[in-house]
Amino acid sequence: MDGYQAPSDQEVKVERIIHRACERVVILNTLDFLYGHVLLKLYNAQHYIDKHPDLGLVIVLPRMFQWLVPQGVAEVWLVDQRLGEAHGWYAAIDRFVQQQLPNYKEVYVGRGYAHPEFADIDIERFTGVRPFPMEEFLQRPPHVTFVARQDRLWFATPAAKFLYRVLNKFGLKKSLGRWYVHAQDRLIRRSMDRISARLPGVRFTVVGLGDKGGFGTDVDDLRTQRMDKATELAWCAAYAQSQVVVGVHGSNMLLPTAHAAGCIEVLPYDRYGNIVQDVSVRYSDRMQLFLYRFVDEFASPSTIARHTISMFKDFAVYHRDNRENIF
C-alpha cells in the first residue's frame, strides 16, 4: 500500500508478446522483488492453462524469467525492471495495463498463490528439461549436485557465522569474505570425499553464482558470475541428472528440487518457519519424507555424506515398502 500511495514516475518498458489472440483472458501478475516469489507465482500458470482452457492466460513477468514461460500461454507482458525495484507502484506499468484492457471483452485477475501444490506441477513445461524419473533412481549412475551460493553460505560453526556477520557490518565482506567462500568450498569438497568413499563411481556437479575452481577435474564445475538462458538450462540439466541436490535454504533450491529426485537442505535456525517453502516437492506420499531431508545449519560434511549415502543404500527397501507394497 505504501507504494500505491506514493507511485513512482520512473519509466519502465513493457513489451507485449502475443502467442494467441483471445477475447477472454485471465491475467497472472508475477511481479515481485524476490526471485523465489516470482518463480512461485509463475508456477500457478499451469493451473490456469489446464483448468481454464476457455480463457487465454496473460502473464505479467520480469524479463529475466522469459525462458520459463510455459507453452499454452496466450500473451506475455515482459517488464524491463530489476527485481529490487519491484517494491513500489509504477505509473508506467499501470498505464500500459490500462491501455491493453480495452483489447478484451472479459478480463479476470488470476490468483498467484505463493505455495501452489508442487506435486501437480510439470516442471518440464516451464524449463523444457525432463526431471529425474524416480523409477530410475538406482538404475542411473549416482550423481550429486551441490548448489553453492556466495550470498548465503554454509558455515562450519556458529563462531564462523558470527564473524562473517561482523565483517558485513564493518563493510569488509568483499575484501575478507572470500575466506568464507573458500571455507564453504572445503566443506563441499570434504562431503564429496566422504560420499565417494562409500559410493564408487559417483559423479558431482557444482552450480551457483561464483568463480570456478578448487574442486579438481573430477567435478563438473558449472559456477559462473553471469547468468543467461544457456547457463540456466545447463544447470537444470545437471539437476535432472541428479538423484540428490545439496544446498543452503533459499529460492536457489526451487529449480534444483523441481528437477532432481531428492535433496538435502542446510536449514538456518532463523528459517525454521520457512521450512519446505523453497522446495518444489514432487511427491505427495511418504517418499517426500525420505527424499527431502533437512539438516542443521552447521551440519558437518559427515552429516551430509551420511544422508546422501542413506538415500542411495536405503532407497530400494523404502520404495518397496512405501510405494509398491501398498493398496
Residue ranges and their predicted role:
Residues 30-41, 152-157, 181-183:
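A short, glycine/small-residue-rich beta-strand->loop->alpha-helix junction that serves as a flexible
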Residues 63-70, 211-217, 271-277:
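Short, charged/polar "capping" segments at the starts of alpha-helices
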Residues 37-41, 187, 227-231, 245-250:
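Short, glycine/acidic-rich beta->alpha junctions
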Residues 235-278:
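A donor-sugar binding/catalytic signature common to diverse glycosyltransferases
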